[in-house]
C-alpha cells in the first residue's frame, strides 16, 4: 500500500530502485524491498517480504524454514544504511557505510516464509561519521527481533 504525502511534504516512501542506488547490497543479499515513513536523520521503516524462494531457506531449515536471525539483523542494518545514505546524500561511489557493533540483540519469534517484516529504525545518537541506531523487526504486531547497533561512514577512495 502506497501512502500519499500531504501537499507540500516530500514523499516518504523509497522504492527498490532508489534503495539499490543508495546501498551496494544486491540480491541475494539485499534484504530490504522498500522503505517508508522516512524522516531525514531521524527514522525510517524498512519492509522485507519474506518468500519461500529466499536462498537461505534451502539449508535453514528444509523441513521448517526459518530466516536466520543474523539476516534479520542485517535487514535492519541495511534499513539504517538507507536512512543514512538518503539523509546525508552520500555518494555511493565514494563512501560506504560499515556496521560497527551490535548490542542488546534479542530474537523473539521465528521469521517464516510469507512474513512481511516491518522494521522501524531510529537514530539514537550521532557524532561525526558514527551513528547509533535502535530497531525492531515486526511481523504484524509481534516483535520478531530487536537490537541496537552502530555504523560509520567511511571513504572508499
Segments (PLM) and residue ranges:
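N-terminal leader/capping segments at the start of a protein or of a new domain
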Residues: 1-31
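HotDog/MaoC-like acyl-thioester-processing domains
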Residues: 1-11, 40-41, 111-115, 122-157
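Hydrophobic beta-strand-centered segment that forms part of the acyl-chain substrate-binding groove
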Residues: 4-13, 80-118, 144, 152
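Beta-strand-rich interaction surfaces with strong enrichment in secreted/lumenal proteins
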Residues: 20, 63, 106-109
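Catalytic strand-loop segment that frames the active site of acyl-thioester-processing enzymes
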Residues: 24-67, 72
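Hydrophobic core residues within well-ordered beta-strands of beta-rich domains
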Residues: 29-31, 117, 131
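Conserved positions in beta-strands of structured domains
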Residues: 33-36, 103, 108, 120-124, ...
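Active-site helix/loop of acyl-thioester processing domains in fatty-acid/polyketide metabolism
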Residues: 35, 67-91
Amino acid at each position: 500500500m502506497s501512502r500519499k504525502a500531504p501537499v507540500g511534504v516530500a514523499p516518504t516512501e523509497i522504492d527498490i530502485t532508489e534503495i539499490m542506488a543508495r546501498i551496494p547490497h544486491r540480491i541475494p543479499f539485499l534484504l530490504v524491498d522498500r522503505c517508508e515513513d522516512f524522516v531525514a536523520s531521524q527514522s525510517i521503516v524498512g519492509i522485507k517480504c519474506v518468500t519461500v524462494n529466499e536462498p537461505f531457506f534451502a539449508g535453514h531449515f528444509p523441513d521448517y524454514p526459518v530466516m536466520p536471525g543474523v539476516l534479520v539483523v542485517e535487514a535492519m542494518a541495511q534499513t539504517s544504511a538507507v536512512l543514512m545514505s538518503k539523509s546525508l546524500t552520500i555518494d555511493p561511489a565514494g563512501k560506504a557505510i560499515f556496521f560497527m557493533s551490535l548490542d542488546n540483540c534479542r530474537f523473539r519469534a521465528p521469521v517464516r516464509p510469507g512474513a512481511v517484516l516491518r522494521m522501524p529504525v531510529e537514530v539514537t545518537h550521532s557524532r561525526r561519521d558514527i551513528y547509533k541506531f535502535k530497531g525492531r523487526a515486526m511481523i504484524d504486531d509481534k516483535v520478531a527481533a530487536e537490537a541496537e547497533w552502530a555504523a560509520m561512514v567511511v571513504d572508499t577512495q
